[in-house]
Amino acid sequence: MRSDYCGTLRSEHIGKTVSLYGWIDGWRDHGGVIFLDLRDYTGIVQIVADPQRTPESYHLASSLRNEYVVRVEGRVSARPEHSLNPRLSTGTVEVYADTLAVLNRAETPPFAISKDEEVDEKLRLKFRYLDLRRGRMQKLLRLRHRVMQIMRRHLDERGFTEIETPVLVKSTPEGARDYLVPSRVNPGDWFALPQSPQLFKQLLMVAGFDRYYQIARCFRDEDLRADRQPEFTQLDMEMSFLSMEEIIALNEGLVAAILQETMGLELSLPLPRLTYAEAMVRYGSDKPDTRFGLELVEVSEVFRESSFQVLSGAVAAGGKVVCLPVPGAEGITNTRVKPGGDLFEFVTQFGARGLLFARVREGGQVDTIGAFSKSLTPEIAAGMIEKTGAQPGHLLLFGAGDRTAVPTVLDYMGRLRLKMGEELGLIDPNRHNLLWVTDFPMFEWNAEEKRLEALHHPFTAPRPEDEHDLKTARALAYDIIWNGVEVGGGSLRIYRRALQERVFETIGLTEEEARAKFGFLLDAFEYGTPPHGGIAYGFDRFVMLIAGEQSIREVIAFPKTQRAQDLMLGAPSAVAERQLKELNVRSTLPPKTQG
């Protein structure tokens, strides 16, 4: 029976007989005495096998290899002064092995467990059970557990009830694709895996639970990025009878508690806020990284009368001319900004038709090249400098477009801002800026489907003063942003049937479609639905930022690859024809390409 954990032994344990279990982390033979490093999740302790004291243990120790699982019983002793190891928490003691037993042997691992070295990610994911044995991964997953504990404790203390919601639900696709599950007992019908517990948590408010939370598993069949997985975890919350200000304040307290306990970071509350419009105009993003300046500046009026039609034409068409003033940019060559250059190509992949630039020289002279140069009058040059505050050494980068192209212009200029900030070393990795973005548009235009769609989801309430024209309404929505990453988002919800039906109509749902997809919700609104709102946090992403990692795969025990594959299990995989028949499903793929 285990008496102690390896990493917990200290000088005060000297003289104690202990029983330890763990893995062999290292093996050394020094002058006939064998030293073993025994590891468990708490750390490493040195084991001494001395042939003069216990010949049997010494003989067995000589046959051990790394990652063998062993049991050790022996007495804790003080290390000789010459062998003290300040790098170990147990570096003042060692255990003389009186008995030693091998519980299991191990093959040579495909990568070192005890060394914190770079390993190919595919190899790590294939042997994830070994990857998770490494100290770094142990710390990350235990951090994840700790964050979850803090969340639960904080919400429990404030009257929240944790309630689980179903995983087999109705498919109501709005946005990302659903994962579908065929029903064997109802042939031809399908369940979907939930993209969020959104509707269930609203129904729990109808049911009178007042304050709900859940650490929920969610599923989305979408293309993957560094911060996306097909299955992921949310901290999901919903509250009745609270204003937007009260919900934001409650969540600021939650986030502050988590960051203080895990990082020692003291947040200054209340957090700053930006409206969606402000964030887009100043940063070109609805999730702005405010750790550095380099803000966008609208210079439309400067170019309204310009002879350069690219810019004046955009303004005349109700559009904008946007400038990114980049200081200390002497090292950025014209070649990089011209067609074929990396900065030019960077913005074109996000919809830019080109990238104009000008430089501010000593004495305030502004120069550029090509047709833009010919239109650059002294008045326009002076206007550019006055509007942007540019100094000698500044590189001025311009994007422009008509009214319909403004969102695209702001987006690619915002991305260019981030790229320049990273390249010029303007972003302090040790700084943590959190803020709220509010007043999002209710809807955005889907050019492919030629219809409006909900920017967040169609259950978000509009600002009361905007209800008369839902197409241009602002939402009572709020996202919390951390260093340019959205870690949570929520809103006040619609709780009146008539308004919900108007929103469904605005996004192009017929009355019959709305009834088929959401009839249960509309019916619930007839039975005394309270005002309510909530928020959901991307839990994996939140832990990733706390840990200082770059991918959520680092803080998930068994993640999928960016191709949505589990390399360890070999999933997804083909299934037997018999299983498909039981489900009344037939594959249209040729047999050789299935799976």
From Swiss-Prot:
Primary localization: cytoplasm
Keyword Disulfide bond: no
Compartments, record wording: Cytoplasm
Positions bound to ATP: R220, D221, E222, Q229, E486, G538, F539, D540, R541
Biological processes annotated in GO: aspartyl-tRNA aminoacylation
Origin: domain of life: Bacteria
PROSITE patterns for the chain: AA_TRNA_LIGASE_II
UniProt catalytic activity: tRNA(Asx) + L-aspartate + ATP = L-aspartyl-tRNA(Asx) + AMP + diphosphate
Annotated EC: 6.1.1.23
A Pfam family: tRNA-synt_2
Gene Ontology CC terms, in alphabetical order: cytoplasm
Region feature (Aspartate): 198-201
Gene Ontology molecular function, alphabetical: aspartate-tRNA ligase activity; aspartate-tRNA(Asn) ligase activity; ATP binding; nucleic acid binding
Binding site residues for L-aspartate: E174, R220, H456, R493
Annotated site location: Important for tRNA non-discrimination: H30
Key words of the record: Aminoacyl-tRNA synthetase, ATP-binding, Cytoplasm, Ligase, Nucleotide-binding, Protein biosynthesis
InterPro entries, per database record: Aa-tRNA-synt_II, aa-tRNA-synth_II, aa-tRNA-synth_II/BPL/LPL, Asp-tRNA-ligase_1, Asp-tRNA-ligase_1_N, Asp/Asn-tRNA-synth_IIb, AspRS_core, GAD-like_sf
Family of the protein in this entry: Belongs to the class-II aminoacyl-tRNA synthetase family. Type 1 subfamily.
Known function: Aspartyl-tRNA synthetase with relaxed tRNA specificity since it is able to aspartylate not only its cognate tRNA(Asp) but also tRNA(Asn). Reaction proceeds in two steps: L-aspartate is first activated by ATP to form Asp-AMP and then transferred to the acceptor end of tRNA(Asp/Asn).
Subunit annotation: Homodimer.
Name by which UniProt lists this protein: Aspartate--tRNA(Asp/Asn) ligase
Organism: Gloeobacter violaceus (strain ATCC 29082 / PCC 7421)
Gene it is expressed from: aspS
